[in-house]
């Protein structure tokens, strides 16, 4: 029924996806995933877990990855607005250490595909945001890893959210990007 527009970012494999939205005075309808179209666009993945979070303005989640149960993610916002970021942690990649970001909102309905081998995070720009994502592997607390959101090597340019960033105590403990080897991402 619906068609998707797939736009490759400057980092190969990281894709912004725009669904076709059918709207009228009653509201709207859109497909948020259609395996055949995603496969045709090069995203031939099996998603095994769906997650949802709710956060308030200034919450900065990330930058997260899993070392062993490496996850690809298809993310979108169902309420509010976030700035979403993917950081290439694949040591054999030409874009190793580079990042790309996109604004996702309930208004623009964009989705963001982040492949395995990337760190991922987002900053909430609205009063409240609800964030949904599909993962290619299950959550494994023993595989948790991350990069500081303000790492000087990666140097993500987070937009102004109108308040101080709110991060978890755990996210403040991540080793700097330059101190990590990322050997678990060599196959990606």
Set out the residue ranges of the language-model regions.
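Non-catalytic, conserved peripheral segments adjacent to functional cores
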Residues: 1-107, 126-128, 135-188
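Short beta-strand His + acidic residue motifs that chelate non-heme Fe in jelly-roll/DSBH
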Residues: 85, 112, 120-125, 133
């Amino acid at each position: 029924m619906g068609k998707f527009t797939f736009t490759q970012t400057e980092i190969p494999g990281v894709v912004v996806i725009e669904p076709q939205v059918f709207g009228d005075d009653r509201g709207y309808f859109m497909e948020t995933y259609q395996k055949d179209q995603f496969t045709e666009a090069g995203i031939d993945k099996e998603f095994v877990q769906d997650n949802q979070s709710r956060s308030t303005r200034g919450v900065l989640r990330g930058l997260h990855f899993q070392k062993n149960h490496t996850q690809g993610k298809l993310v979108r916002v169902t309420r509010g607005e976030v700035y979403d970021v993917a950081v290439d942690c694949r040591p054999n990649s030409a874009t190793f250490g580079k990042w790309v970001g996109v604004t996702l909102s309930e208004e623009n309905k964009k989705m963001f595909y982040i492949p395995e081998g990337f760190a991922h995070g987002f900053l909430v720009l609205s009063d409240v945001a609800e964030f949904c994502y599909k993962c290619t592997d299950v959550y494994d607390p023993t595989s948790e890893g991350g990069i500081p959101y303000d790492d000087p090597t990666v140097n993500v340019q987070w937009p102004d959210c109108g308040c101080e960033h709110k991060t978890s105590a755990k996210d403040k403990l991540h080793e700097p990007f330059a101190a990590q080897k990322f050997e678990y991402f060599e196959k990606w």
